[in-house]
UniProtKB/Swiss-Prot annotation:
Pfam families: TusA. Belongs to the sulfur carrier protein TusA family. InterPro entries: TusA-like, TusA-like_sf. It comes from Thermotoga maritima (strain ATCC 43589 / DSM 3109 / JCM 10099 / NBRC 100826 / MSB8). The active site is at C17. This is Putative sulfur carrier protein TM_0983. It comes from the Bacteria.
Length: 79
């Protein structure tokens, strides 16, 4: 069973800043409150920047899950 009921998945693996940050913001703009965005990243700096951006926008980071060496999933709840 899935941890979260993901509404949308964004895969920005292979991209470096600022692309993952910009694409995450763009995806969140098109989502409704209560929906969950799952973001796949492999750029370590994005693991720090995306949560900062998300919080500034007023959304909630539910979890940052390490899924492999230098690979993470960030779960974001739209507020």
């Amino acid at each position: 069973m899935a941890k979260y009921q993901v509404t949308k998945t964004l895969d920005v693996r292979g991209e470096v800043c600022p692309v993952p940050d910009v694409e995450t913001k763009r995806a969140l703009q098109n989502m409704k409150p209560g929906e969950i965005l799952e973001v796949w990243i492999d750029y370590p700096m994005s693991k720090e920047r995306i949560p900062e951006t998300v919080k500034k926008l007023g959304h909630e980071v539910l979890e940052i899950e390490e899924v492999g060496p230098s690979e993470w999933k960030i779960y974001i709840k739209v507020k």
